[in-house]
Amino acid sequence: MPRYFKRNWQETRGDEFDSWGTSVWFFEVDDHNFPTRQIEVYQNGKRLRYDSKNPFDDYGQLSDQALDLEEFKELEIRQDQFQLEWEKPEPRS
């Protein structure tokens, strides 16, 4: 049964895309706590989505590490909250 989490990152990327600002990450994880879908929403509006069909792009990739549920236990969200974010379009420039 998938579980869903939302995590605010208060640090910027520290790479050539640092100007995107801070971000909010959303995770759907499997029974072993590995991400199966992941969304990154940046302060500038940029949205990155990763899953098994799109595991990486020029900006990042689907995490290959299991989430530490001790660290994420207070960050669980409902499936519909995750799905709403997953379906949001990329803002137009």
Task: Identify the function of each model-found stretch.
Residues 1-4, 24:
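Short, hydrophobic/aromatic-rich segments at coil-to-beta transitions
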Residues 9-17, 25-52:
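Short helix/strand-capping turn motifs
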Residues 1, 34, 54, 88-90:
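Intrinsic-disorder/low-complexity coil detector
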Residues 4-8, 38, 93:
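Positively charged, low-complexity intrinsically disordered regions
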